[in-house]
From Swiss-Prot:
Region forming the signal peptide: 1-19
UniProt membrane topology term: Single-pass membrane protein
Lineage: Eukaryota, Amoebozoa, Evosea, Eumycetozoa, Dictyostelia
The species this protein was found in: Dictyostelium discoideum (Social amoeba)
One Gene Ontology term of the molecular function aspect: peptidyl-prolyl cis-trans isomerase activity
Activity regulation note: Inhibited by both FK506 and rapamycin.
Localization annotation: Membrane
Any one GO biological process: asexual reproduction
Chain ranges passing through the membrane: 148-168
Name of the featured protein: FK506-binding protein 3
Region ranges (Disordered): 173-194
Family to which this protein belongs: Belongs to the FKBP-type PPIase family.
Length: 194
């Protein structure tokens, strides 16, 4: 019974910790949802945008203008930029202007960047999409190759199954282990009568 309560407590703790999702907030957009007239960005698309990166107080820490006014280019999903920027550009429209807030967990983390981004700092971006190029079509057999995440998930599942089997063998259910075999009734010694 105690093991059951401990397991239940651990599961409840995990459920609460996973329910507190961290996400990117869209603060402002000039394109209402569902009214995109051009291309919409998705994972695998090559996106080109102009940006201004700011802290909460409005201080600019980076922008396209600082880099000569050139647009910034990346492929969504390649993990070459901070995760929050990739998440914040999913479903953005070509030509759209969008302001987003990225929590520090999806930006520069606990430590920040020395002399540039303070530790545990949420950041804000004003984005303007210049262009979106769709991802090139992949051959069908490429789509069958599992990702690293899928392989890790299946490995963890296999490990969990092995662990459960080990626990079941190591700690059998005691209520079932003392039952007599079916068939002949068990003989008991009768008390001697004089």
């Amino acid at each position: 019974m105690n093991k059951f309560l401990i397991a239940l407590l651990v599961l409840a703790t995990l459920a609460v910790s996973f329910s507190q999702e961290i996400g990117v907030s869209i603060l402002k957009t000039d394109t209402p949802k569902g009214e995109c007239k051009g291309k919409t960005a998705s994972i695998g698309d090559y996106i080109s945008l102009k940006y201004v990166g700011k802290f909460e107080d409005g201080t600019v820490f980076d922008s396209s203008e600082i880099h000569g006014g050139f647009s910034f280019n990346f492929t969504i999903g390649e993990r070459k930029v901070i995760p929050g920027l990739e998440i914040g550009t999913i479903n953005i429209c070509e030509g759209e202007k969008r302001s987003i807030k990225i929590p520090y967990q999806l930006a520069y983390g606990e430590n920040g960047i020395e002399n540039a981004i303070p530790p545990r700092t949420d950041i804000y971006f004003d984005l303007e999409v210049v262009s979106i190029e769709g991802a090139p079509a992949q051959p069908f057999y490429y789509q069958l190759i599992p990702s690293v995440g899928t392989i890790i998930a299946f490995s963890m599942l296999a490990g969990f199954i092995v662990l459960v089997k080990f626990i079941i063998k190591r700690y059998p259910d005691e209520s079932n282990s003392k039952k007599p075999a079916p068939g002949k009734p068990k003989k008991t010694k009768a008390a001697k009568q004089n």
